[in-house]
From Swiss-Prot:
Residue positions binding Zn(2+) 2: D153, H180, H233
Protein name: Dihydroorotase
Domain of life: Bacteria
Catalytic activity: (S)-dihydroorotate + H2O = N-carbamoyl-L-aspartate + H(+)
Cofactor(s) required for function per UniProt: Zn(2+)
Binding residues annotated for Zn(2+) 1, in chain numbering: H61, H63, D153, D306
Gene Ontology molecular-function annotations: allantoinase activity; dihydroorotase activity; zinc ion binding
Top enzyme category: hydrolase
Task of the protein: Catalyzes the reversible cyclization of carbamoyl aspartate to dihydroorotate.
Length: 425
């Protein structure tokens, strides 16, 4: 399929481009970008007037639940949700059943995604075997099989010596370690952020310091061995400060946050709303402000969703018993566009955090519209108004705290490898 994407505002931070231009796609690759372009006879033309044309969005942190938990989500439904949200690539976390701790599981995911998925899927392998936290996984084998990072996401690696060795080994073979930073003894039986709201609701709280201490440990270990570390789903003002200070002294630390941490506070839990229960939990207003400040000054490198689908039966229970996590692939873009409206980021900075930087950190070879690159492209309609409903979501699971909310902004067209895989709501 050959394409001419015409008259859109092309924003490509990798090339410093922000202008009204045309994009020509031929044989699955970007052929050229410029004004007044034409393409071969029979090419499909996409009118991008009034829209943004950007490198395909990349979500470096999703849970596709495949294999083993397909009643929540699978590669087919998860990638359909991804392209509906404008994502052309996703990185799937390894807390599946069985976990992605060997070549066979990684190969299964890659092969299924190639034959049945709607977008690129890059698996993340485990740090430890079975995510049990006692023995390192075969990281070299995982990298060779196509894993782009390693993580025990969903829980931390408690053993500091094991984490030190993981960082050393991963650095030696050139694969990123993604840390779920959480001090479990401080978390205890907590189910939401510790503070005024948890006290008022009579729910056991999780103190911010549980994340802060674990973040500091990871940074100190990485600094000690001279290895890179990536901190997942940053949610506290303390973690932002610790990461900012570490970057200032040259530590190879990067991090991500998720849209719910810069749009919601723990007030969303009122009414015991289980669709506002996730890990890390929603924090307070000063944490939200710190997350925005971290995005603005570059402390926070990436925006990821931590898309975590759960079946209704796992959410329609008492708050204490409900599973942690929310779906986020289809709401991430409009929520993140609010950062531009608020002056936190400009459009180029937003696309950098949602496409270019994730690709750079994980070595995906995406995140750019340079001629010759794979044509992964997202066309964004910033004026599109739509309502989040269960029927509007492509994900198998509907556990979103924004059900019933009206969103501004959506993917108008998602192109993966030169093929149109989604054409708007």
């Amino acid at each position: 399929m050959n394409l001419l994407i015409k008259g859109g505002r092309v924003i490509d931070p990798s090339q410093g481009i922000d202008d009204t231009l045309d994009v020509v796609v031929e044989n699955g690759l970007v052929k050229e970008i410029g004004k007044g372009l034409a393409t071969s006879a029979g090419a499909e033309t996409i009118d991008a007037s009034g829209k943004y044309v950007v490198p395909g969005l990349i979500d470096m942190h999703v849970h596709l639940r495949d294999p083993g938990l397909e009643y929540k989500e699978d590669i087919i439904s998860g990638t359909r949700a991804a392209v509906a949200g404008g994502f052309t690539s996703v990185c799937c976390m390894p807390n599946t059943k069985p976990a992605i701790d060997n070549k066979a599981i990684a190969s299964y995911i890659i092969n299924k995604a190639k034959t049945e998925g709607a977008c690129n899927v890059f698996p993340v392998g485990t740090i430890t075997q079975g995510m049990h936290g006692d023995r390192l996984a075969e990281m070299g084998e995982l990298k060779e099989s196509g894993c782009v990072a390693v993580s025990d996401d969903g829980k931390p690696v408690k053993n500091s010596e094991l984490m030190r060795r993981a960082l050393q080994y991963a650095a030696g073979i050139g694969i990123m370690v993604i840390s779920h930073a959480e001090e479990l003894e401080l978390v205890g039986e907590g189910v939401m952020n510790e503070g005024f709201t948890s006290t008022e609701l009579g729910l056991k709280g999780i103190p911010r310091v549980a994340e802060d201490i674990a973040t500091a440990r990871e940074i100190m270990l990485a600094e000690y061995v001279g290895a890179p570390i990536h901190i997942a789903h940053v949610s506290t003002k303390g973690a932002v400060r610790i990461i900012r200070e570490a970057k200032g002294r040259g530590v190879k630390v990067t991090c991500e946050t998720a849209p719910h941490y810069f749009t919601l506070t723990d007030d969303a839990v009122r009414g015991y709303n289980t669709n506002a229960k996730m890990n890390p939990p929603l924090r307070e207003a000063d944490d939200l402000a710190a997350i925005k400040a971290g995005l603005k000054d570059g402390t926070i490198d990436c925006i990821a969703t931590d898309h975590a689908p759960h079946h209704l039966d796992e959410k329609d229970v008492e708050f204490n018993e409900a599973m942690n996590g929310i779906v986020g692939l289809e709401t991430s873009l409009p929520l993140s566009l609010k950062l531009v409206d608020e002056g936190v980021l400009n459009l180029s900075q937003l696309i950098e955090k949602m496409s270019c930087k994730p690709s750079e950190l994980l070595g995906l070879g995406r995140g750019s519209l340079k001629a010759g690159n794979v044509a992964d492209i997202t066309v964004i309609d910033p004026a599109k108004q739509w309502t989040v409903t269960e029927s509007a979501l492509a994900s198998k699971s509907k556990n979103s705290p924004w059900l019933g909310a009206t969103m501004a902004g959506a993917a108008a067209c998602t192109v993966v490898g030169g093929k149109i895989v989604f054409s708007g709501r």
